[in-house]
Amino acid sequence: MLSGIVVTAVLSATAASALTYQNVSEGYSPADKTCEYLYRTFPDITSFSNQSSYIVDNTNFWSAASVLNPACVFAPSGAEDLAIAVKALKYYGSPFAIRGGGHMPIGDSNNINSTGVLLSSSGFKRLALSPDSSTLHVGPGNHWGDVYNFLNNTGKSIVGGRLGVVGIPGFITGGGISFFSWKYGWSSANIASVTGVIASGEVVTATPDNDFSDLFWALRGGGNSFALITEFEMITIPAPVVTVGTTSYGTTNLTKERWLDAIYNFALYGGEDCHECTVTPSASTGTQYPNGTTYTAMKFFDGNDTASPALSNWTSPYLNATSDTFAATTMTEWSQSGLAQFDSIHGLRNRFHVLSTYADRRALQIIHDTFFTLVPIHLSSLKTYIATLTPMPISKQYFRASKVRGGDPMDLDPEDGPHIWYEMSVLYTVERDEEYVSAFLQAVDEEVKKMLAAEGIKQPKYLYLNDADKGQPVFEGYPAENVRKLKQIRHKYDPEM
């Protein structure tokens, strides 16, 4: 199966004539030889375990499961330097991993152990508007908070992440759900060009209509296994002011039922009636929630309006708030507002798992009840944990907007919608709890599928790549012809994969 979310490839050796690899120690592992070569060639951007830059790149992840201690870290700031590293990796036959913002919680999706080299995007921090401000050049070493901060006072934004702490490259190449997606589609639908290094060590720029248009298409949701990206050029959108915030609704049974009803109705009608509106509901329980499961929603309106009719089910008197930050602001201010909260959980362990259903109230109830019934059965022995269910209502309009600027590997049919995509996440503290978390997520997945089948409720095959757990069959949900095309494209640009 097409790996999609991981770029940890072993590139076999080729003739040495293309490079001069002098005075590299004999008897070292392929990774150690590569590290020595990179250090001799680029001493300022090659680091080892006793250096602060290595420590940052090896530990600054969304989940501590990604701290794997590579042989060395190479952090270039230019595409040509990265190209030299790719050729060295190929010559020595060293495994490697590439990291962007470090948000994917699957450990080996963005790091590698001492058998390989970590290529860090942290040096690719360029942010530059085009002369007419129609596009923004974005280096993959940024986070979305950096992007929104750069665009402050320009009246522009990007179809990017909903939280400032999220990284850039994995988000985009997995599709990317944005606040703005109901108007403009996937984040990946708003790429103007992508520059990166392919397996041969060549630096290429892919656009919809140049010689690398197939690569451009693959990177619009096919994952990051096609090139090492050094820059995105993203189409800008007008967004001088937005209305956004998080509303908490409490823990009562009535709140739960109305919260579920609101999700279902927004999937059917809200996203269709208001293309400026987005709702990201979440329900959380765990050791930090002594009063029981707490129901919240992150609400968004593209403009200045706290009373959009499409969001009425998320406000009083239907759902009464216990706290509310929904207010007019900017994407810059919003992206900075939650940093302290995320700093408080930095260094913990996290797992995602994704499910999909059509917009069906019975399915929504089944998944909610199954998730929260199985939490105490599987997770009660954990000293600290937070289990969260995030059912995201995805309207037909989302799929329509994603097709405006051409196709993508997901190729979701608007007439197949609306969907609800469920991100299940567990935050926990120690590695030994991994087996309990894995058993919990697997049990929810299996029980939900069994109960839905018993009720005659069909599920879409599509699973959102960016919320998927390791081993989930993401690409089985892509059209078979598109998967074949993705494999052909990957073989074209990396024949040894």
Residue map of PLM features:
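Signal-peptide-cleavage-adjacent N-terminal segments of secreted and extracellular proteins
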Residues: 19-87
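Glycine-rich N-terminal segment of FAD-binding domains in flavoprotein oxidoreductases
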Residues: 51, 62-124, 138-140
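Fungal secretory targeting signals
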Residues: 1-20
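Structural signature of FAD isoalloxazine-binding scaffolds in flavoprotein oxidoreductases
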Residues: 106-125, 180-199, 228-232, 422
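Short, structural beta-strand-to-alpha-helix junction motif
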Residues: 134-135, 142-147, 165-168, 325, ...
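A gly/ser-rich beta-alpha-beta helix-loop segment of oxidoreductase catalytic cores
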Residues: 154, 158-194, 198
